[in-house]
From Swiss-Prot:
HTH luxR-type domain mapped to chain residues: 127-192
Protein name per its UniProtKB record: Fimbriae W protein
Protein's GO biological process: regulation of DNA-templated transcription
Keywords of the record: DNA-binding, Fimbrium, Transcription, Transcription regulation
NCBIfam families hit by this protein: PRK15201.1
GO molecular function, one term: DNA binding
Gene3D superfamilies: Winged helix-like DNA-binding domain superfamily/Winged helix DNA-binding domain
Amino acid sequence: MLRIAIKEQNSHFEHGLKIIMTRLANQWQQKIDFLPPEEIDNADIAFLALDDDWFSAGCYQIPMHTQHQLRAIICNKCDKEKLMFRPCLYMLPHIYREDDVEEITRKMILILHKRALRHSVPSGICHYCTTRHFSVTERHLLKLIASGYHLSETAALLSLSEEQTKSLRRSIMRKLHVKTEQQFLKYIRVNLHFLLSK
């Protein structure tokens, strides 16, 4: 049983993808199960549409997901050039909304046979994406936190007040879409260890 999830706002396009996949699965006598979008992390293959805020640091999760799941990007052809500056997304298979049925079917055969991406996306590829929206001071703060410094120590090292440092930390957390300090520290530990080598 192949579990598939599609996160796409255009319901007509999503329905079209499901028809193509169902037809192919029937030809191969392969059973597929379409999961709801909120269960995308449990799917074997996930189709992810680029939303309006895809420029954010959200793509840092791609290397982690591709260790156990094939991810494919749904986007417009005009996004292709922008994707070149997001190597973690550019490495994934793409389905363009402008593709005709024949082209989507051709791409889908590779995706469903899991030949579209041979290896997981390496975690090092995301360094630029993850930190591109941070100021120099924010990067410095992240590096100090990743090194294990407490807030009061980082404030002193950055020549800032504790209140300014807290404000800076909140700004970083917003950019990373994390809400609690525990999530923030876990995020740094899991995704930003590369800061220590800089």
